[in-house]
Amino acid sequence: MRIVVKVGTSTLAYPTGRLNIRHAEELVKVLSDLKNEGHEVILVSSGAIGMGVGKLSLPARPKDTTTKQACAAVGQCELMYTYDRLFSAYDHTVAQILLTGVDVEHTERRVNIQNTLTRLLELGALPIINENDSVATDEITSIGDNDTLAAIVACCCKADLLVLLSDIDGLYTAHRPRRLCQAVRLGQEGDRRKRSSRQVRRERHHGRRYLVRYDQLR
């Protein structure tokens, strides 16, 4: 089975931007186990800007574009270093792919992305994809968020399953206005699977506002 997994900044890092080592190790352990079972895994990972904030010891997440780009450049190195180190412990090789809106909109580039992903999976590597926040700054070059990027990647590589991981406490059964929505707490595993197609809109401390489909890796 070919699986695309997306993980966000709020899952990987603390509000300070520092890496949540326990969460990162648990994620890598689960994904490595999936690969050991014979599944093809692609990881779409946020976290570059947040980790850049921590690495540069900034007091807060910057608001200006240039500093955000600088944080993304620094944080992406830290992010990939962490993934490479953790996956190496399970004898898995990772590969970095950074994309922009231009890459996914342009037909020839999209085909190149598909070919690269296919070959990496054939070689047994685990592709790790992120939006190239160091250069993607406007409506033309920016994809918007990594939930959208994960969906694009899943379609591009003809994935069998798309999993969007989140640390939210519950799900809404409908869109806004919220007074018309029923708040559903996450229950037992069976309930989670049954509700996997429902969507939630929630804003986290480092993430953008996004739509999430909850599912499980097991």
What are these model-predicted stretches?
Residues 1-217:
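Nucleotide/pyrophosphate-binding catalytic subdomain
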